[in-house]
């Protein structure tokens, strides 16, 4: 069934690592520049990557991810939103809430935290030298759906009273509350990746 694979992003090989670990196609939103080179374009297309123009914005990217999950596919996502640009650890940055917004569209779909360790040893940003012998490790934690996280007292803690309060608000108030939930889910996901050892 569908799932969201969420991991840290320190190297160009991170998507490949997730694809190999999943043993079934994993789709990613990839910037259009990755499709400019014919060889790279063929690789991206053959592995199910989705070409995304920067100017379509977050809503357009989310719509494409929704299509993947709606058809029962695996959607890979990097909660940080981009590859880490830091030259020294810690590389893990604050997450963007796109992962939570996507998970909220499919509240029963599992979000699988995947910490990728050692990817920078294979190929580091700005370094064209590839070390094919470097060890890369993927540590996977228990999946959690957005719906389960919302109901969990250690997560969103959305009980019956909170639901009533949420429904009593106008649209602006509801959006404000949901933004807080998205931020909370994302922050806990990033903290899970850190706990798993993501550098």
Task: Locate predicted features.
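Non-catalytic C-terminal accessory region of glycerolipid acyltransferases
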Residues: 62-199
